[in-house]
Each structure stands twice: as C-alpha cells, then as structure tokens.
C-alpha cells in the first residue's frame, strides 16, 4: 500500500514537472528556431559612415558650396572617396533612417498586383542610390538560387523599377514569377505603378524576428535630400580589426572634408545592432527570460532528482539485501531506471491532455500574418509533437541521473551476534 501511494505521488510530481518543462522547452524551441532562420542579409565587416553638414554660423562654412550644383558634385566626390579607400569591397548609399538596416526606423508600404489589388502584402521600404552597391554591402542574395546580388544587376534606368523579395512574390503572384510584373501601393490610388526587376530573399528586421517582405526603390537625391543620405562600406576581412576605425578617421577626416560636409561618425554594424537590440528591449527581454527559464529548469531538475533520490534511499534496505545475495549494481540501477521511466510513461498521457487544453485556449504564442514557407512553430500538431518529445527526453535524462548514484552506496549490515548458553554453575 505504501509503495502504491509513493508511486502515485511520484506520478503527480512528474505530471507537474512535465507541464512546466513543456512550457519552458516550447519557448526555447520557438526562440532558437526563429534565430536559426536565415537573415537574408549580412552585417559582417560593415560600417556606417555618417556625414555632417557645417552650420552657417561656422567659420569654415562656405556659402558657394551650398548651391545645388556644388552639393551634387560634393555628393559624388564623397562616394568616390569612400569607394577608393584601401580595403573597401563595396560602398552603398541610402536615404533616411528608414533605409538604414537594423535600426529602430521603419517605413512600411503595401504592394499589390496591379491587375488584382486584393492580393497584397505589407513590406519594408528602402530607398537606395542605384549608382552605389547597397545590396552587395549587406550581402543580399537571389531568392531563386541564393547567388549574391549586386545593385548593378538590375535595370534602374527604368524610373518605375522596383526589387522585391520572395514573400511578396508568393503572396501577390502565387506560384508565378514576379519579374516583369506590375505592382502598386493599394492604399495610394494616385501613386505610381512599379515594374518588378528582381526577387531577393526575405530579410529580418531583428535577429529573433521572422523574415519579412521588402521593397527596394531607386532614389537619385536632390540637393535638399543629400544631407539625409547615409553611407555604408563593407571592408576586406584582412584590414578589419580594432585599429581600422582609428586609421580610417585619421586618413579620411581630411579626405571627406568636402564642401561643407565633414566626417561626423564611423560606426561598426556590430555596435549598431547591439545598441538597437538594447534600446528595443530585445537584449533585456532575452536575458530575463533566459534567467527565469534557467531558474525554473534548475528547480524542476532538483525537484525530480530529489524525489527519486529519496525514493531510492527509502529502499536502501532492499538494495543492500539484493547486493548481499549477489545482484550486481548495474542490474539494480537498471531496475530503478526502468521503474522511473515507467512512472514517466504513466504521467505522459495526462500531461499531454492538460497541455492540449492550454493550446486550445490560446496559451501558446502563435505567429500571425504572412509566415515563411514550412514554418514549424505555426504547424501546431508538429510543434506540439516535437516539443513534447524533447520534454520527455529531458525528463528521462533527469530520472536516469537521479537513480544512478544511490545504488553505489548500500547500507551497512551489522554483523550478527553469536547466541550461546550461559553456565550459571
């Protein structure tokens, strides 16, 4: 009877531990899966070059350099000098904060099939200078075969040119190719109609977010728009290092003193990404969740191990007797492990039933909107099955760890005393 009650309590404890561990494993499954998805672009060895404009009150300000012809000429000189810097593999320019990858700025537009505006998709908008190689700087690739992309691959001479991504093609045109097709913003009836010149891989806004659709439009900045342009360079790994920034500033501070422009700031994309993650709470949220999940996981581990250690300890007499009659320790350990696994198997069906209720009431975070193809976390039966398999394996390992050490220390048996007759004579 006592053994039966003990088994019931162990099953109840395993049931609770299974449900808690399932929630923990599910979170990490989705988080790790999202981070493992391709970003669609890269930031390695990329630097952002920010140019400042002298105010009219500055003693170095020259009014003649502020007219439109001088501004356009200075803009071209800035691009040429960045391209010609030793070790620069590619240079790109884009307009405004929203065209700067991995920042807090966002400019969203809608794209729809010009022939059927009911088929539409929301995308991130980027305005790039087609005379620079913005797409190569950030290692964009073709959706069809994954080849690296260069901005010069597309016909930007067409004022209606636009380059989109795989998600736009799939959502707006289905299985058909989007290249050569017309798209427009369904929310802007008077807006222009664009012609798709190419389809790239979808891109992530943040590392832990899902890939999104994007649209790249050409901008040929006017004199008024030039001060808002941002510049990006990708450098050769051979020249990358802790001294690159100091060397660049030392050499280019004079070279980039063009007209009323000056070198304002040079920032690595590693720093930009880290600052963005911190300002948006991504770093803090991830660390807090990791700490809470680690604490919860440690408690589950200690709870289950403690229960089985206590269970084995209460049977030390039985274990010692079996060892005394010749049972090897490996056989005893195997029996204890089998008992633990059997108890886990008994708790599993009820745990699955409870978890299914949580899923049905919407307890899980299920992604919405347009998702990548074959996105596992959105396939609930598959996600439910995989997470529970991982949870079961995790608890099985914990049980094996819990039952393994105790049989190595059987109780000491006291030597029996000899009985004899006492001579009272």
Residue ranges and their predicted role:
Residues 1, 31, 386-425:
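C-terminal membrane-exit region of the final transmembrane helix in multipass inner-membrane proteins
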Residues 120-214:
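Hydrophobic secondary-structure segments that place a key small or acidic residue at a functional site
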Residues 158, 166, 191-286:
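"Rare, low-scoring activations can occur
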